Amino acid sequence: MSSNPVTAPGKGVGPQAFLRACAQFATGVAITTVLDSSGAPHGMTVNSFTSVSLDPPLVLVCIDHKARILDHFLTSQAFAINILRESQQDLSIQFARPGEDRFGAVEWFAGETGVPLLPDALATLECAVFQRVQSGDHTIVIGEVVSAIRHEGLPLLYFSSAYQRLDPPAPSNTEDHDSR
């Protein structure tokens, strides 16, 4: 196993070295959605999303301070995380591009909080804003999950700065039981 140290211990790390190292962590791909104050939908592709707590059920998403969508996350009381399936790479790219009309030809429906939910997502977590924390050049938005929708399928993944796909899993004898 080889390693390529880019900084000496205790000297800090530059942004490019940090990004290259973090790119080695495989993540799922999601689109986070929110409404603005006039009720218009907004969304953005993210991979900086994670679960935080089971009781209460909390998730977080990190929004860059330069992102246009940040203002909507600072004023809205709800948002959603739409976890993408492997066939939704084009949708991920559409919501990652700069521009205001990302919802132009995208089908969506309003969840119980009113936020846009994507019907073909692998899973959707609808959240009430629980807390916002400024940290470095991002705002961490923590949401309490008020609704969860799950479908069968395989996730879209991101690793080493590129989209990836899983091999289909081997058949299992266990059943998935969602409760609550």
What are these regions (language model features)?
Residues 1-180:
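Basic, polyanion-binding surface patches
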